[in-house]
Amino acid sequence: MAQHYKTIGLIGKPNHDGASATIQTLHKYLLANEYKVIVEVSVAQSLDIKKMKTGTLTDIGEQADLAIVIGGDGYMLGAARVLACFDIGVIGVNRGNLGFLTDLSPSEIIKPLEQILSGKSRSEQRFIIEAEVYRHGKLKSSNSAVNEAVLHAGKVASMIEFEVYIDGTFMFSQRSDGLIISTPTGSTAYSMSAGGPILTPNLNALSLVPMFPHTLTSRPIVVDGNSEIKLILANDNHENLQVSCDGHVILTVMPGDEVIIKKSECSIRLIHPLDHEYFNVLRNKLSWGNKLY
């Protein structure tokens, strides 16, 4: 088999029996076919493999040509945020629920993987976003998000008040439970559950989706993906405010703070099987109707 990739990184959810079994299968297969393999260190501890090379996500990003992530979309998001700034392809094996980002089935993995490893695959760039919190003009914290950045109160069902600016132009002020700023990748996640639009992955766009706004006229809006979105928190908000990045990373926000959300310079290079079709994924995952005839 011709080798399109030379070094493969294996990443999986630690202490997950299904993920561990898949990683052990892949590790054995890849070594037998003379690939170099790096196993992410946190999952390596739960594997029954005597000799293996291990490394952090950063090590895999720096040394590998392809990363195979075994888990659900949530674990894929965590790995992708780190790997986005490296020149590495990423493909997922679904060990979760819906699996919008994880193409391969663990029960039928070797045949499609052979095709991918020989270069018979599709490559797709997905942009990510950066969220930055400023206090009195100084950067206090920042992080990236593959799916969405969400401004919200720290406690459930608590309204907050803020202003929204697009490229420095005032758009609106709002009292609501928060605001979701979603990428096209995230448009089938939290944003969709909140009534936001589905954006096809090739769009250079961001959607702003209000969370339970205290008005009947507030609706989601789609803006250019190169826009800089600025949220200014009202001074009379309660102190317990947050920005969540993909639901994993929490940035603390105080009344009067400014939150800047914009496209990152990094992007994810997703690798898909040749027969991958985005609308087919939507149809299967969301139980849409098939062709009539």
Curated annotation (Swiss-Prot):
Its EC number is 2.7.1.23. NAD(+) binds at D73, G74, N147, E148, R175, D177, T188, A189, Y190, S191, M192, S193. It comes from the Bacteria. GO terms for biological process: NAD metabolic process; NADP biosynthetic process. Its cofactor is a divalent metal cation. The keyword Transferase applies. One of its GO terms (cellular component) is cytoplasm. Its main location: cytoplasm. Keywords: ATP-binding, Cytoplasm, Kinase, NAD, NADP, Nucleotide-binding, Transferase. One of its GO terms (molecular function) is NAD binding. The active site is at D73. It catalyses: NAD(+) + ATP = ADP + NADP(+) + H(+). It is found in: Cytoplasm. Involved in the regulation of the intracellular balance of NAD and NADP, and is a key enzyme in the biosynthesis of NADP. Catalyzes specifically the phosphorylation on 2'-hydroxyl of the adenosine moiety of NAD to yield NADP. Belongs to the NAD kinase family. This is NAD kinase. The lineage of its organism: Bacteria, Pseudomonadati, Pseudomonadota, Gammaproteobacteria, Alteromonadales. The gene is nadK.
